[in-house]
């Protein structure tokens, strides 16, 4: 197993074999990092996990379902923080996202998935639904509250604002490279953004 990958969290529902299911998820994560989505097969996961064919197909009928569940385990849902200010909310949310990406192999997996998803509509749909949208939803709630508090002027395109807030971290991670634990100064980013967003 990759040294960066932690054991997955407990699976939802009532799995027939928790140990087998976690072994399958760990194997899927390792192979996604090592060979990518395109080369990953149910058989390779089964072999790596050391389980029988019936065990893996009893819960996952396809590679898409298995990878989707693996992404869900690795990238947890985020609740929108409510500290009373946009700066406080964004700092809390950004900290949670960075901490998540820095553990469990996420920082290694995300560039691999993003690169392959450009040419694979099915993978892109999984990536967007399970990784991108939950984070956008949390940030959207943060921005909506900021508008309600009068910190951001009304009438702005919130989807564009989400891109502006999230863009620097994505660019630093995938283009210029950097430590996920210390990507950039959130204070500096907030100062630059608020100069253009304040009423």
Whereabouts are the PLM-identified features?
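Short amphipathic alpha-helical segment with a characteristic S/N-K-E followed by hydrophobic residues
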Residues: 24, 39, 62-67, 77-78, ...
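Hydrophobic alpha-helical segments that form the core
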Residues: 153-175, 186-193
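C-terminal peripheral helix-coil segments that are non-catalytic and often amphipathic
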Residues: 1-9, 92, 99, 137, ...
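Amphipathic alpha-helical packing segments from all-alpha helical-bundle domains
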Residues: 108, 122-148, 158
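Hydrophobic alpha-helical connector segments
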Residues: 78-110, 161
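Amphipathic alpha-helical segments used for helix-helix packing
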Residues: 70-71, 101-128
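Short hydrophobic/aromatic patch on the recognition helix
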Residues: 50-60
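Basic, helix-initiating cap at the start of DNA-binding domains
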Residues: 1-48, 65
């Amino acid at each position: 197993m990759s040294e960066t990958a932690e054991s997955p969290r407990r699976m939802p529902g009532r799995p027939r074999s928790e140990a087998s299911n976690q072994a399958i998820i760990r194997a899927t994560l390792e192979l996604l990092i090592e060979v990518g989505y395109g080369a990953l097969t149910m058989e390779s996961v089964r072999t790596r996990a050391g389980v029988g064919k019936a065990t893996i197909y009893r819960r996952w009928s396809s590679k898409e379902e298995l990878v989707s569940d693996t992404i869900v385990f690795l990238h947890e849902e985020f609740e929108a923080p409510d500290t009373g200010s946009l700066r406080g909310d964004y700092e809390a949310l950004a900290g949670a996202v960075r901490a998540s990406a820095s553990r469990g192999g996420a920082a290694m997996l995300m560039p691999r998935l993003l690169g392959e998803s450009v040419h694979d509509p099915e993978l892109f749909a999984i990536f967007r639904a399970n990784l991108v949208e939950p984070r956008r939803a949390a940030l959207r709630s943060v921005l909506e509250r900021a508008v309600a508090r009068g910190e951001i002027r009304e009438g702005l395109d919130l989807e564009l604002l989400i891109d502006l807030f999230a863009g620097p971290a994505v660019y630093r991670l995938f283009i210029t490279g950097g430590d996920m634990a210390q990507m950039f100064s959130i204070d500096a980013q907030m100062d630059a953004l608020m100069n253009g967003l304040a009423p």
